[in-house]
C-alpha cells in the first residue's frame, strides 16, 4: 500500500479498511503518517484471542480448533463459518457469497492468512497511531465483539467510535448505508 501511495505521489489519503485490512492501515499509518489524512477502520481487531482482561472474542483453544478445521476441511469450514462472520441470517445470500469467495481462494494461502490473522497481536501498535481515526463497530459481532471496538477507540489517540445498529462482522455488505452515513458524517466534521 505504501509503495502505491509513494508511486502515485498522492496527497494524504483517507484510508478505509475492514477487519484485517483495517489493521494493515493502522500499521501503514504508523510507518508513514504523512501519507494518511484519516483512517476509517471497519470492525478492526488488534487481537482475536482473549488475553487477561482483554476480550478478543476467542479463546486460544477456539482459535486452535478453527485453524485445525481449516487444515482438515477447508471447504466445509468455509460453508460453516461464512454465516457466522456475516451475522445476517435474514439475508442468506450474503453468507453464500462470502462462502463462495472463500471457496475461490487458494486453500493453502487462505490457511496461512488465517493463521497470521488470528495469531497476531497488534494491541501495542494502536498507541503509536497519530492519524485521526473513525472506528466503526457492529453492536453484535461474533468475530470482533463490541469490547474490541471500545478497546481500539480507547487506544487510538484521536479517534471517534460509532457503534452501528448491526449484527455480524461485515457491515460494509450487510448495512452499507449505515457505514456510508457514518463515514460521511465523520468526514464532514474534518
Region annotations inferred by a language model:
Residues 115, 122, 131, 145-154:
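Short alpha-helix in the alpha/beta-hydrolase fold that links the catalytic acid
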Residues 140-144:
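Acidic catalytic loop of the alpha/beta-hydrolase fold
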Residues 50-58, 68-128:
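Conserved alpha/beta-hydrolase catalytic His-Asp/Glu region
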Residues 26-72:
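Flexible "cap/lid" loop of the alpha/beta hydrolase fold
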Residues 129, 135-137:
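Short beta-strand/loop motif that positions the catalytic acidic residue
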Residues 1-13:
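Conserved acidic catalytic loop of the alpha/beta-hydrolase fold
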Residues 158-190:
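Catalytic active-site module of serine/aspartate enzymes centered on a nucleophile-bearing elbow/loop
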Residues 13, 17-19, 138:
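Conserved alpha/beta-hydrolase "nucleophile elbow" surrounding the catalytic nucleophile
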Amino acid at each position: 500500500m505504501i509503495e502505491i501511495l509513494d508511486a502515485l505521489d498522492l496527497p494524504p489519503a483517507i484510508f478505509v479498511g475492514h477487519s484485517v485490512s483495517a489493521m494493515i492501515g493502522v500499521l501503514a499509518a504508523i510507518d508513514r503518517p504523512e501519507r494518511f489524512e484519516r483512517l476509517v477502520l471497519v470492525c478492526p481487531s488488534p487481537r482475536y484471542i482473549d488475553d487477561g482482561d482483554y476480550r478478543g472474542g476467542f479463546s486460544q483453544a477456539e482459535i486452535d480448533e478453527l485453524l485445525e478445521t481449516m487444515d482438515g476441511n477447508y471447504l466445509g469450514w468455509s460453508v460453516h463459518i461464512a454465516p457466522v462472520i456475516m451475522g445476517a441470517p435474514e439475508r442468506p445470500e450474503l453468507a453464500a457469497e462470502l462462502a463462495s469467495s472463500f471457496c475461490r481462494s487458494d486453500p493453502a494461502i487462505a490457511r496461512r492468512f488465517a493463521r497470521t490473522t488470528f495469531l497476531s497481536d497488534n494491541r501495542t501498535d494502536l498507541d503509536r497511531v497519530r492519524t485521526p481515526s473513525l472506528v466503526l463497530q457492529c453492536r453484535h459481532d461474533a468475530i470482533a465483539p463490541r469490547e474490541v471496538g471500545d478497546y481500539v477507540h480507547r487506544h487510538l489517540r484521536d479517534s471517534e467510535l460509532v457503534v452501528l445498529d448491526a449484527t455480524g462482522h461485515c457491515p460494509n455488505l450487510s448495512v452499507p448505508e449505515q457505514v456510508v452515513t457514518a463515514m460521511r458524517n465523520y468526514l464532514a466534521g474534518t
